[in-house]
């Protein structure tokens, strides 16, 4: 039996009489006067400003605020204030029960359905990043488009990176449910265009559309999880969804190969359509949209457009694309001294600098509000996410290359051999999310990630041609356990440290930096590998033409050199890859510097939403 509103007020106000509770209830139910925007709810001068969203902790949890730079958040556990000394719940909170955050708490089988739908949507979105790796040969043969091969992957990844910040603005200003459904529609439309593509150009356009939608699907899934359950349950389910992202990275090539060999490469995209349809139906039925901020509702269309920071959007999109194209083409398709690379580098740098100036000038209307970035928990989470995810990307790409080149593994088998790391990430990610939900604090587990992860990464640098399964399985597990412990926690930290209205923007910043870091350090690793491979081959085989080995794919190096030189070539190849692992290990260790400035905040708390009046 649900307690009455009167009983809830009585329980909040401690050992007070029901008579006093009735008085407080009457005060709560009085309509606001036109001369004030504050709702008086106690005897003294106490009031709750309707424009703020402070967090009120449960007993034993951290008491904090999320205004300004975030430096006013108290460190460590704080006792609950007496009823007359702290924040008092609003009428909406007392009517809704505990944790009335965002769109409303979902529980039971409805919660399970929503979480399953979100997980499947993120899985499909992540799958699209790697599913084409084994299907590209068939696609290029069908369209006779070998020169377009790079764009099949880049068109998707570029748009995901570029649009992440824009969706942060949209989710903060409009109802999360409807923005999410719009992005899901875009992702599905892009998948349909790709599946039915009659030409290479149509496939590239479809990939770009899917990327625009995919950026919003991933970010929106994280935000919906934050809105439909109490804050202390969020870490577990964010970790679950992040783990699925890792699984999709490995399963993608396997699934793409199965579709290509037994059905058609077009099913790499058609598979998204029924899953997206089911996800949309569940979101429509079970997720209650968050009420829009009344100040935003009352603004004109033009004023709302200005709130989206259109100037910032115009600058950030080409800036990111220029920088990523420089990293993709530089030293590979074109020399670093080529005029195309120089022009892109100058344009990207100039646009990025101009974007920074615009963000400082725009203030709270900026795509990346300076006050949010100044919050030390937020910028610590950014540093942590960049280093940890960059390290994870390096090992995700180059461990399979080591297996293919050194152990003669096929693409499919190399993915299977990479499973110890992925399983370690997924399992430990879920365990750390569960532990944070139980303990309340995420900082200890964020320290665990770079410490354990860098040990595993360091061990992987010792791999050599004769290393057996015992070595590479154990080392991968250690790396996976460390990486998994912190994979989802930057989002948890940001969502805990910020006020409810800033969560979508903070989450977008973390998602953007993670995606950009993955692309950035993948290209950096590629540059390191190519330069070290040429150097090591020339040092191991002086006087021998090693250009064919340097240009060969990992599975072709045995046929690219004479048998008598193969042992030295394999050793040089292995050393070149482990030298890339040094960069990954260093990145993983540097993630600890992102944890140091973070405040010890507890997830065992709830936000008090402002009372909205029509």
From Swiss-Prot:
Cited CDD domains: MFS_Azr1_MDR_like (cd17502)
Region (Disordered): 1-99
Leftover remarks: In A.calidoustus, the austinoid gene cluster lies on a contiguous DNA region, while clusters from E.nidulans and P.brasilianum are split in their respective genomes. Genetic rearrangements provoked variability among the clusters and E.nidulans produces the least number of austionoid derivatives with the end products austinol and dehydroaustinol, while P.brasilianum can produce until acetoxydehydroaustin, and A.calidoustus produces the highest number of identified derivatives.
This protein's record includes keyword Transport: yes
Name of the protein in its database record: MFS-type transporter ausY
Function, as annotated: MFS-type transporter; part of the gene cluster that mediates the biosynthesis of calidodehydroaustin, a fungal meroterpenoid.
Disulphide linkage map: none
One GO CC term, this protein: plasma membrane
Keyword Transmembrane helix: yes
Residues of this chain annotated as glycosylated in UniProt: 15, 375
Polar residues composition-biased segments: 30-39, 56-66
PANTHER family noted in UniProt: MAJOR FACILITATOR SUPERFAMILY, MFS EFFLUX TRANSPORTER INPD-RELATED
Entry's family note: Belongs to the major facilitator superfamily. TCR/Tet family.
Compartment list: Membrane
């Amino acid at each position: 039996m649900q307690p009455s509103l009167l009983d809830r007020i009585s329980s909040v106000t401690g050992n007070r009489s029901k008579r006093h509770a009735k008085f407080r209830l009457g005060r709560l139910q009085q309509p606001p006067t036109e001369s004030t925007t504050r709702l008086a709810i106690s005897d003294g001068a106490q009031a709750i400003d309707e424009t703020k969203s402070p967090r009120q902790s449960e007993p034993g949890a951290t008491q904090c605020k999320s205004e300004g730079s975030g430096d006013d958040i108290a460190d460590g556990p704080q006792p609950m204030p007496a009823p007359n000394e702290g924040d008092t719940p609003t009428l909406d909170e007392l009517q809704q029960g505990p944790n009335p955050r965002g769109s409303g708490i979902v529980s039971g089988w409805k919660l399970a359905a929503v979480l399953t739908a979100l997980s499947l949507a993120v899985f499909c979105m992540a799958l699209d990043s790697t599913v084409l790796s084994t299907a590209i040969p068939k696609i290029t043969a069908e369209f006779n488009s070998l020169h377009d091969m790079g764009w099949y992957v880049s068109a998707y990844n570029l748009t995901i990176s570029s649009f992440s910040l824009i969706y942060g603005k949209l989710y903060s200003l409009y109802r999360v449910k409807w923005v999410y459904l719009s992005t899901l529609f875009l992702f599905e439309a892009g998948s349909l265009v790709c599946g039915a593509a009659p030409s290479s150009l149509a496939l590239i356009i479809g990939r770009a559309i899917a990327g625009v939608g995919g950026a919003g699907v991933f970010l929106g899934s994280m935000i919906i999880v934050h809105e439909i359950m109490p804050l202390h349950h969020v870490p577990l389910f964010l970790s679950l969804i992040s783990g699925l992202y890792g699984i999709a990275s490995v399963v993608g090539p396997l699934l793409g190969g199965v579709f290509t060999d037994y059905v058609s490469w077009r099913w790499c995209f058609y598979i998204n359509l029924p899953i997206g349809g089911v996800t949309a139906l569940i979101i429509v039925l079970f997720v209650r949209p968050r009420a829009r901020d009344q100040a935003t509702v009352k603004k004109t269309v033009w004023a709302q457009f200005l709130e989206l920071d259109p100037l910032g959007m115009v600058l950030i999109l080409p800036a990111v694309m220029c920088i990523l194209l420089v990293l993709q083409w530089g030293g590979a398709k074109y020399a670093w001294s080529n005029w195309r690379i120089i022009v892109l580098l100058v344009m990207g740098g100039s646009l990025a600098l101009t974007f920074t100036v615009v963000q400082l000038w725009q203030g709270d209307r900026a795509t990346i509000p300076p006050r949010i970035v100044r919050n030390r928990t937020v910028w610590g989470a950014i540093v942590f996410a960049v280093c940890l995810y960059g390290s994870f990307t390096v090992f995700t790409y180059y461990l399979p290359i080591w297996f293919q080149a050194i152990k003669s593994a096929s693409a499919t088998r190399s993915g299977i051999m990479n499973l110890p790391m992925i399983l370690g990430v997924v399992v430990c990610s879920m365990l750390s999310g569960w532990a944070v939900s139980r303990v309340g604090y995420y900082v200890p587990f964020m320290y665990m990630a770079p410490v354990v992860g860098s040990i595993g990464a360091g061990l992987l640098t010792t791999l050599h041609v004769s290393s057996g399964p015992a070595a590479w399985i154990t080392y991968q597990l250690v790396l996976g356990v460390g990486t998994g412990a912190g994979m989802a926690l930057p989002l948890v930290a940001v969502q805990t440290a910020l006020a409810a209205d800033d969560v979508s923007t903070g989450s977008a910043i973390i998602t953007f930096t993670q995606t950009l870091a993955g692309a950035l350090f993948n290209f950096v690793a590629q540059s390191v590998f190519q330069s070290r491979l040429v150097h090591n081959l020339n040092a191991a085989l002086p006087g021998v033409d090693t250009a064919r080995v340097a240009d060969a794919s990992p599975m072709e190096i045995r046929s690219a050199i004479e048998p008598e030189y193969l042992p030295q070539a394999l050793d040089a190849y292995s050393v070149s890859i482990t030298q890339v692992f040094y960069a990954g290990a260093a990145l993983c260790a540097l993630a600890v510097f992102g944890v140091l400035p973070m405040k010890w905040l507890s997830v065992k708390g709830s936000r008090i939403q402002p009372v909205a009046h029509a």
